[in-house]
Amino acid sequence: MKQDTEMGEATNGYIGTPGTVPVSHAGNDSGMRRMRTASILMRLTAMALCVTALVTMVTDKQTHYFNFASTTIVKTAEYTNVLALKVFVYTNGVIAGYSLLQALWTIVAKSSYSTSKARLWTTFFLDQFIVYVLIGVTGAATEVAYIAEKGESDVAWPKQCNNFGRFCSQVGASVIVCFVAILTLVFLAVLSAKQLFIHERPSRTTRKDGYYTSNQ
């Protein structure tokens, strides 16, 4: 009788066949709802930032006239002239689309616990992947902007921003916006990892050494 009483107290009044006793997800649900809301807002923010960086780069164009004696040479600077900047634009477009789709999927999901394990793992890996990809692409664009601004004497590359100042300024603005997007995506990667951890964590009360203990 004494053991039954102790077992009953340990399980909040449950006395019955030893085994697994389900407990409420109320506490976890509240936290998951907050993370779900934060995830939606941050994904929409990341999408907006990536689109802003993309549009800023795509609309960046400047023409300069070089006069040599009686000859005038016209040169136009735009993102399509540099492979790194083209990859920058394409990558931001893909990540913006991914962020929008993930936000919409999260909105239509009925609850955090109804989300499949496979989707949580997929989201976790994709969120990590796009952060690394965007860091690499933005780093390459930053290097291009730096060389255009400072030149590279070792390979006799002259400065270009003296002639295309507005173009360089707009490239810099696009890169800065993209770095803010990276910070947002890093936060999302941490958030998706936490959501996966909570979903995978046992949320049942199990018997151990004759007593019922919670795994939460």
UniProtKB/Swiss-Prot annotation:
It holds the Pfam family CASP_dom. Its main location: membrane. The chain crosses the membrane at residues 38-58, 87-107, 129-148, 171-191. It comes from the Eukaryota. It is a multi-pass membrane protein. Keywords: Cell membrane, Membrane, Transmembrane, Transmembrane helix. Homodimer and heterodimers. NCBIfam families: A_tha_TIGR01569. This is CASP-like protein 2U1.
